[in-house]
C-alpha cells in the first residue's frame, strides 16, 4: 500500500471529482458506481471512498 508517483494525480482527481479518481484506479466496475452514488448523496463521502479505493489498491 505504498503511495507511488502515479497515485498523486489520482488523489487530485479524487478531491475534485471523486468518480474520476476511482475510474483511473479500478476502471468501470462496481466501485465506480458506488463512488458516483456516494458523491451524489454527499460530496465528502465520495471523496473518502475514492481515497480509500486509491489507497487500498
Curated annotation (Swiss-Prot):
Belongs to the UPF0057 (PMP3) family. Keywords: Membrane, Transmembrane, Transmembrane helix. The chain crosses the membrane at residues 3-23, 36-56. The lineage of its organism: Eukaryota, Metazoa, Ecdysozoa, Nematoda, Chromadorea. It is found in: Membrane. GO terms for cellular component: membrane. Its main location: membrane. This is UPF0057 membrane protein T23F2.4. It comes from Caenorhabditis elegans. It is a multi-pass membrane protein. Pfam families: Pmp3 (PF01679).
Amino acid at each position: 500500500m505504498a503511495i507511488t508517483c502515479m497515485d498523486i494525480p489520482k488523489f487530485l482527481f479524487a478531491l475534485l471529482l471523486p468518480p474520476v479518481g476511482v475510474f483511473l484506479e479500478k476502471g468501470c466496475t462496481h466501485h465506480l458506481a458506488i463512488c458516483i452514488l456516494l458523491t451524489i448523496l454527499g460530496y465528502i463521502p465520495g471523496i473518502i471512498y475514492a481515497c480509500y479505493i486509491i489507497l487500498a489498491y
